[in-house]
Each structure stands twice: as C-alpha cells, then as structure tokens.
Curated annotation (Swiss-Prot):
It catalyses: a quinone + NADH + 5 H(+)(in) = a quinol + NAD(+) + 4 H(+)(out). Keywords: Cell inner membrane, Cell membrane, Membrane, NAD, Quinone, Translocase, Transmembrane, Transmembrane helix, Transport, Ubiquinone. NDH-1 is composed of 13 different subunits. Subunits NuoA, H, J, K, L, M, N constitute the membrane sector of the complex. The keyword Ubl conjugation does not apply. PANTHER family: NADH-QUINONE OXIDOREDUCTASE SUBUNIT A, NADH-UBIQUINONE OXIDOREDUCTASE CHAIN 3. The chain crosses the membrane at residues 14-34, 66-86, 96-116. Its EC number is 7.1.1.-. This is NADH-quinone oxidoreductase subunit A. Its main location: membrane. One of its GO terms (molecular function) is NADH:ubiquinone reductase (non-electrogenic) activity.
Length: 145
C-alpha cells in the first residue's frame, strides 16, 4: 500500500510536468510570432516554383487504387509486427506457439491470394472475360448509298 504522501508527490510531479510542458509550448509559439517575418505583400501567399507562375490547381484526384494499396500495406505491416513479437518469444512459446504462428501465416497467405484473385493488386485495366472477334461485313450484304 502506498501512503497518501507518495500519491500526492506522484500527482504533484505530474502537475509540474504538465504546467512546464504547456508553458514551453506557449513560449515557443509566442517567440515565433514575435520573431517571425511580417511581410504582408499581395503575392505573399501565392505558390512559387522556380520562377514560373503556377497554372491550375494543386488538388489532384487520385485513383482509389492508391488508397487500397496503402490500406493493404498497413494491414500486412501490422501483421509483420505480430510476427516480430512472436519471433522474440519463440523459445518460450514452444511448439504450440509455432503452430499458432504457422496458422497465422497461412491466414495471411490466404488473404493475399484472395486479393490477387479478385484483382485488387492489378494496376492494368480489367482483363477480358472472353475474346471478342471482329466481325466482317461481306460485300454482298453491304448497303449501297
């Protein structure tokens, strides 16, 4: 059991830390405001790239494929962290841990094969389901103008 003085000392230290942290942040913001540049020209906030005036907008619409690849990366990266944690404790986990990790890897591979199967990782245009043969019009069936 901790005594009341230890609890108060612990909370007092946290309060001092919090006050000093907030004070330091305010000091840095105030210093930047006082020491920062005060240029207020007409073209101050316009973008400038190598002396060439920009044309158009900087807002580009990206394909959803970029977001999908980013989500897949995050998902599989988190699983890599789990495998790293397992690898550090492999001796303590024994064969049971090995079997669990093997099942975990198999589930990851099944997910990866599913993503490949549905074409989520394909950057090329959609594949054709069947070949379309070009039709030929015979000269006898052609209408004359």
């Amino acid at each position: 059991m901790s005594t009341t003085t230890e609890v108060v000392a612990h909370h007092w230290a946290f309060a001092v830390f919090l006050i000093v942290s907030i004070g330091l942040c305010c000091l840095m913001l105030a210093g930047a405001w006082f020491l920062g540049g005060k240029a207020r020209g007409r073209h101050t906030n316009t973008p400038f790239e190598s002396g060439i005036a920009s044309v158009g907008t900087a807002k580009l619409r990206l394909s959803a494929k970029f977001y999908l690849v980013a989500m897949f990366f995050v998902i599989f990266d988190v699983e890599a962290l789990y495998l790293y944690a397992w690898s550090t404790a492999i001796r303590e986990s024994g064969w049971v841990g090995f079997v669990e990790a093997a099942i975990f890897i198999l589930v990851l591979l099944a997910g990866l094969f599913y993503l490949v199967r549905i074409g989520a990782l394909d950057w090329a245009p959609a594949r054709r389901q069947f070949d379309v043969k070009p039709t030929t019009i015979s000269h006898a069936n052609r209408q004359k103008p």
